[in-house]
Design a protein with these regions (language model features):
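Short amphipathic alpha-helix used as the core "switch/output" element in two-component signaling
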Residues: 37, 61-73
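Receiver (REC) domain active-site loop signature in two-component systems and cognate sites
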Residues: 55
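C-terminal output helix
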Residues: 103-114
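Hydrophobic/aromatic residues positioned on beta-strands within the core alpha/beta folds
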Residues: 75-81
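Helix N-cap/capping motif at the beta->alpha junctions
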Residues: 28-37, 60
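Two-component/phosphorelay signaling modules centered on CheY-like receiver
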Residues: 10-28
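Conserved acidic segment of CheY-like receiver
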Residues: 1-10, 16-17, 49
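Active-site residues of response regulator receiver
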Residues: 52
């Protein structure tokens, strides 16, 4: 599975890379602006994006807003944020979960694996 981590906190980026890096192809970015640049490439092939909500330059919500109008996006998004209550109300087609910081690692791994399996089962 190919995972993109987008978070402005270096400790969170390192933690998530450590959790997923051994078994998956993981890339790490520090802001939403870079995420939009990478995800705008139709050949990016990321299965799952772990996305912080509040970041400098471009927020996670703006990343989702920007990409929501695109057709045929198969990438699944999971928001991990200290602003979980705000994110729970988002209605973006590829947003599969929101987790509050601090989060449970086992729960996150389960959500990532489940979102990838359901996408694969549906042919996405």
């Amino acid at each position: 599975m190919k995972i993109l981590i987008v978070d402005d906190d270096p400790a969170i980026r390192l933690l998530l890379f450590t959790v997923f890096g051994e078994e998956h192809d993981v890339s790490v970015l520090c802001d939403g602006h870079n995420a939009v640049s990478v995800l705008s490439d139709p050949n990016h092939q990321f299965d799952v994006v772990l996305l912080d909500l509040k970041m400098p330059r471009l927020s996670g919500e703006m990343v989702l807003e920007f990409l929501s109008g695109w057709q045929n996006i198969k990438t699944k998004f999971i928001i991990i944020s200290g602003f979980h209550d705000e994110a729970r109300h988002f209605k973006y087609p590829n947003l599969v979960a929101t987790l509050a910081k601090p989060f449970n690692i086992k729960e996150l791994v389960r959500i990532v694996e489940t979102s990838h399996q359901s996408a694969a089962a549906s042919g996405a």
